[in-house]
Curated annotation (Swiss-Prot):
GO cellular component: anaphase-promoting complex
The UniProt record lists the keyword Cell division: yes
Record gene name: anapc15
Similarity comment: family membership: Belongs to the APC15 family.
Function of the molecule: Component of the anaphase promoting complex/cyclosome (APC/C), a cell cycle-regulated E3 ubiquitin ligase that controls progression through mitosis and the G1 phase of the cell cycle. The APC/C complex catalyzes assembly of branched 'Lys-11'-/'Lys-48'-linked branched ubiquitin chains on target proteins.
Region (Disordered): 52-121
Pfam families xrefs: ANAPC15
Superkingdom of this protein's organism: Eukaryota
Protein name: Anaphase-promoting complex subunit 15
The keyword Cell cycle belongs to this UniProt entry's keyword annotation: yes
Pathway field: Protein modification; protein ubiquitination
Species: Danio rerio
Gene Ontology terms: biological process: anaphase-promoting complex-dependent catabolic process; cell division; protein branched polyubiquitination; protein K11-linked ubiquitination; protein K48-linked ubiquitination; regulation of mitotic cell cycle spindle assembly checkpoint
Compositionally biased residues, Acidic residues: 61-91, 98-121
Amino acid sequence: MSALFPSLFPRVTESLWFNLDRPCVDEAELNQQEQQHQTWLQSIVEKDNNLMPIGRPIFETFDEEEEEDDEDEEDSEEDSEDDEDMQDMDDMNIYNEFPDDGEINEVDMEGADQDQDQWMI
């Protein structure tokens, strides 16, 4: 056939793409793969388990009194900040409930003694 005309025959399928006759994985092989996966996970857990961590040693005892004092100071600071925040929120809520009672300076738009036509000039 001439190279100028395309072939009208169907293309041969790629056997790696369309392999319909491959065998299914049986239960024994699946169990073996699961066991290998579990041993792999266990080896990750146990890897370098005996190394000392960086930082404070495990045997160091902590002074509990100092920790409690620090926590008390932090709690008192947080409480005072919370009280200030609540006061601010209360002030905002009062203003939202009664907006006319606030100190708002009203502007006289008409101009008491001025001529109305003067602003056009």
